């Protein structure tokens, strides 16, 4: 059963960034400060990277997403308001009519999220 819920959601900045990393952004929903986790996307870690290459690509992914948002004409959230283990709302982020997750994957700054296996950025980046 799908329930439609109306909510006031807006992106917010924290330390001059809209997004913490390439797949987590800051929002305000009905006046509460929360984070969203972009669905179907995995980007390199920046808080606890396993190698320098992972950190570098993670920062590029974050900066790319922040630039997309800063230059957007329209921003939409598509979510069922489900939360992940860390309390982030799982959501699609649509920027100017395009799925942000898809754009990040197309630009080789992330991969499609796989629940069964964590992507090994250091192993993959070693071969580039």
Tell where the protein language model's regions lie, with residue ranges.
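Small beta-barrel nucleic-acid-binding modules, primarily SNase/OB-fold domains
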Residues: 1-128
């Amino acid at each position: 059963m799908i329930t439609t819920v109306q909510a006031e959601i807006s992106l917010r900045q924290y330390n001059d960034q809209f997004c913490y990393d390439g797949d987590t952004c800051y929002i305000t929903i009905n006046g509460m400060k929360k984070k969203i986790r972009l669905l179907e996307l995995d980007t390199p870690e920046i808080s606890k990277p396993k190698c320098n290459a992972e950190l570098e690509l993670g920062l590029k992914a974050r900066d790319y997403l922040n630039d997309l948002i800063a230059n957007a004409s329209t921003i939409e959230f598509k979510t069922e308001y489900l939360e992940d283990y860390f309390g982030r709302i799982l959501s699609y982020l649509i920027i100017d009519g395009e799925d942000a997750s898809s754009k990040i994957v197309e630009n080789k700054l992330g991969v499609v999220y796989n629940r069964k296996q964590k992507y090994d950025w250091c192993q993959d980046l070693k071969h580039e």
